[in-house]
Amino acid sequence: MVRLREIPRTATFAWSPGAASPLIATGTRAGAVDVDFSNETCLELWDLGLSNDDASQELQPIAKIGTDSGFNDLAWTDSQDNSRGVIAGALENGSLDLWDADKLINGSSDAIISRMTKHSGAIKALQFNPKHSNLLATGGAKGELYISDLNNIANPYRLGSTAARADDIECLDWNKKVAHILVTGSSAGFVTVWDVKTKKESLTLNNMGRKAVSAVAWDPEKPTKLITSTPLESDPLIYVWDLRNSHAPERTLKGHESGVLSLSWCPQDPDLLLSSGKDNRTICWNPQSGQAYGEFPVVTNWTFQTRWNPHNPNFFATASFDGRISIQTIQNTRTDTAQAIADQNQSLDGEDFFAKAQTQPQVSNFSLPKAPKWLERPSSATFGFGGRVVSVGLIEKGKRASRIKITPFEVDEAVAKSTETFETALKEGDLRSICETRASQAASEEEKADWKVIEALISGNPRKGLIEYLGFQDQADEAADKLAKLGLDKEDVNGDTLTESRGSGAKKHKRLQSMFDANPEADSFLSDLAASKGAKTNNPFHIFTGSESEAEQGITRALLLGNFEKALDVALKEDRMSDAFVIAICGGQKCIEKAQEHYFSKQTGGPNYTRLLASIVGKNLWDVVYNADLSNWKEVMAALCTFADDKEFADLCEALGDRLGEQIRSTDDKALRKDASFCFLAGSKLEKVVAMWIEELRENEQKGIETAADDTSFSIHVRALQGLIEKVTIFRQATNFQDTERTKEADWKLAMLYDKYIEYADVVATHGRLQVAQKYLDLVPEKHPEAEIARNRIKLAMRQAAPQRTQSTVPAARTTLNRPLPQINAYPPQPTFSSPAPPAPQNPYAPPTAAPSQPANPYAPPAAAPSQPSNPYAPPTAAAAIPQPQVNNPYAPIGGGGYTPAGYQPPQAPAYGVQSLGGGSVPPPPRASNQSPAVTTYTTATNLPAWNDLPEGFTKPPTSRRGTPATAAAAISSPFPNQSPTFSQGPPPPGMPPTQRAPSVPPPPKGTVPPPRVTSPPTGFTPASNLSAPPPAANPYASLPQSPPIGSTMGIPAPASIPRGPSPYNAAPTMPPPSNRYAPSPAVQAASPQLATRAAVPPPPPAAASPYAPQPAAQPPVASSYAPSTPPPSQLPMQQGPPQGPPSRPGTASSQRKAAPAPPKYPPGDRSHIPADAMPIFEILSADMQRVKTRAPSSFKAQVDDAERRLNILFDHLNNEDLLRPNTIADMAELARAIQARDYETAKTIHIDIMTNRTDECGNWMVGVKRLISMSRATP
């Protein structure tokens, strides 16, 4: 519950009737004394400024006017003649004043409307009729009750006669359903219902002994129900009445500790009632059931008026005599306020604490168990993820029972249908039909071309398909026709083999040799050169005729020797190209390439086909791509499809597409976009073509919106998006596209496509296709931030309930000892010992309860079960050195430790902070009441926490009505009067804390007298080993140590208690508390003669120090039927002489108290003196603590804050350079660095080592370190 604004006035108030920004009118309370003892009385108007987030500035009145007297009541109503309504004031001098609110705000001098003095005494209450705002009822002294009409204010009429009523009317209220019914309450206890129509009494309630009535209120919905309250401190009661039975109240509400002064029934919800009174409290009730929901912050003086806002019931105001009117809300919007004030009180000490507590209002926090009625909805619906709609509707009208219904929902059914069709076709592998269908349905030529190209890529020979798409298959047929007209057969041109012509002996030539002169004479000449073996001709020739040129002779000699390269060089030098090519054919590939290169170098000015041929022959198609005119891009593309190497094909296509893209940008010719898209598709360059497709998507979407008649913009956008995703999907399958950037974290080439994938996944998920959405999200890189969120959302939506494991239980112990329940005995038992007993379970009276293993939940409160994962936000459950299968309480005080006789098998060391047996702690008694105390027996439950435990989800106890925070009371050793504590088993071994605690007992009931405060520690035998033990530092967080009282007939001398740290509020005790908390402390009686004759028992060694609490007083063992009875260890020194007699009279606290520890060098919170070697500890741990605080669940705020406070103790030690030795500081620095590196195992190992081997340095701060390790591990 949050206090939104405060008005610094002791005044009665009224809310403005308008629904706009709320205003409050205040009138100086009659009889109240201001802080400056001023007697000025006035009417003021205040603008609360609730729309302003800054609530730190003090409010100032927006209008003010002086009055002749103080106010007992104020009312504000709507008026047709006054824009802001009329304010009516009930003055102490009997005057009824009316003001125009609008004129007051504007500062007009004639703001007062009228002043009527019909009442002979003070007007105590007034109210406007809720149905007829012109009717005003006023009641006051001597039973005077008037009804005034604002239209005729000078002539009110009176209800009742003077003789009938002589007591004062303290309160009144109009019926909310029947306009002419009015109820009044008087100081004499009369609750009278009036019928204003007949001007007579209707009935009078039998008000339980005629107790004075301070407030009345009608039920806002039921016209026969009303509530009354009494201002008596002896009977602070609220009565719920039903007029159908006026002899007795229907229900009585009890919760106030002093008289009730004001009631306010919420007009919008009859289940909400506010009451305030003399106990400084404002309580919220359910008057229908009598349940008290909770109380609002307690102030420091009477709360005499509380009112709901009439139009916005989220707000209400409460006026008190501490000089404030508090405007609050029932919503928990700032739950950290309570903790902030509690922390502030925690840091105060001594006089500062009590001085602050007198003026500091207390805070409280509670939540309504059900939503207020104005927030309830008879039906509601919301869209859920995954194409679902969740709707809630009432099963039956008038009953608080709803039916939840989840139904599928599709924004656009066409989207879902097309998605299913496409995914089905993909599964069947029928990609060609998809392309054909999409091409036929394409809305533009560009889109149609894209689908045609993709269809070509799907074919068995993609390059041939692309050539056919470009139209060059038809051109090849046309060229063949032209060759046929020249007398050449198509087969002759394209065939790989040459066939002999009939009759002529001529041979056909290959296509690439068509550049040479192809004539019959040349063919005949060549054929004649090849003769068969031994063939003779009639044409003899000479190798050398003598007429040859020198070049011809050189060629001939080279040929004779088979040196074709030299012959080729000579032929090329002489520019005999025909001879050179023939020689090159004989010389092999190297000679051919050399001849071709020479030829093309000579043809620079020749036909264009020679350059193309040069690029083809030289396998350098980059020249064609970069230099060919873009008007012939199709021809270039055809050449690439025909001759390009597979390794270069994609890059060549991309380069050609880039050239087309540059021309698009320079000329803004959108027609070329289709051509560039073709090139990128042919080269499988998805990142390039996607950018164009997305641009087309926007254009097509805009055109669709402009031309669509019935479609919505969402449907148009989704269809365009779906078309893009389909094209990309088919293209990726057709080209076997592999995304190599999925492992990158940023700078993706396909970033635009990834965004579309995420958008499309969201669309299909909205239509309930979660599998499809996940499929496309898996195509997005793992490190993409939006995709990661979307993937997690999909996985959560698709996650099915995991099969329930069969929970196995831990088998109970095979042998269970029969243990009798402890009996209350008025005499302490004699200390006897028996044989050692096996280790007992956690509860000595019942077998252990098996608990199923549960998964670790870092935010759930721990259950008391063995072998359970720890909760990083809950109190520590076991010691770091030796884990224990039990949940321990870090806040419980350490009980006294005894000694172990020889032969006793000690149990395992428990967690630090476990309370020992005997002397279970009980809380300080609550407020006094008339109830008598009752004795409560022990319980056999094993998982009940002690009263001083810190439970998960605990709530703070109600504070005193003076608003002073309670301090820790002195520990009570036994909850039963005249009863010594009874031990249930033998004492623990020396140096080791006990493993069990005594069963918890409930706090004592309220008593009329508080218990006496013990002011000195107990006296007794002091072992030499304890004389020099230094007192531990005061722990502001742990409970005070406690010990059971020593039996009066016990012969064993009581060991001296180790001195505990001083309390900031009370002196150290000098004696153990008495067994009867209502009796003075008795002196220890003389030792029993029977026990005095026995051998003296050696004193027990001091108990091990606990890092959680100050060292408690050591306790001797007492008789137990379960304790071992072996002789004491021989190595322990035996006591010499008889036991000590009774101690002397306790001295003063100052004389008995040990020397207090030296004050720290520097004040708490100072961090300027931390040494350099310890500074990493402070910096790392404090930074990680802040990270945990910002992310930990709010339900664990108390545990987080406690861990932070304990860390501050460590930082104070580091700042003062005390307690921690250099090697411990070095280890803590290593631990901090391990936490920073999230190496929690190393941090835990270091923590265990320090806890185990350096316990003298482990104060209260070590618990904070352990908690931080667990919390940091669980906090993302």
From Swiss-Prot:
Record-linked SUPFAM superfamilies: WD40 repeat-like
Key word Cell membrane present: no
Alphabetized GO MF terms: structural molecule activity
Biased composition regions of type Pro residues, renumbered to the chain: 828-850, 1000-1015, 1097-1115
Record localization: Cytoplasmic vesicle, COPII-coated vesicle membrane; Endoplasmic reticulum membrane
WD repeats: 5-47, 66-109, 118-158, 164-204, 208-251, 255-295, 298-338, 382-407
Keyword vocabulary terms for this entry: Cytoplasmic vesicle, Endoplasmic reticulum, ER-Golgi transport, Membrane, Protein transport, Repeat, Transport, WD repeat
Database matches in SMART domains: WD40
BP-aspect Gene Ontology terms: COPII-coated vesicle cargo loading; endoplasmic reticulum organization; protein transport
UniProt topology in membrane: Peripheral membrane protein
Polar residues bias: start-end ranges: 928-945
GO CC, one annotated term: COPII vesicle coat
Similarity annotation: Belongs to the WD repeat SEC31 family.
General function of this protein: Component of the coat protein complex II (COPII) which promotes the formation of transport vesicles from the endoplasmic reticulum (ER). The coat has two main functions, the physical deformation of the endoplasmic reticulum membrane into vesicles and the selection of cargo molecules.
Record note on quaternary structure: The COPII coat is composed of at least 5 proteins: the sec23/24 complex, the sec13/31 complex, and the protein sar1. sec13 and sec31 make a 2:2 tetramer that forms the edge element of the COPII outer coat. The tetramer self-assembles in multiple copies to form the complete polyhedral cage. Interacts (via WD 8) with sec13.
Protein name as catalogued: Protein transport protein sec31
Species assigned in the record: Aspergillus clavatus (strain ATCC 1007 / CBS 513.65 / DSM 816 / NCTC 3887 / NRRL 1 / QM 1276 / 107)
Gene of this entry: sec31
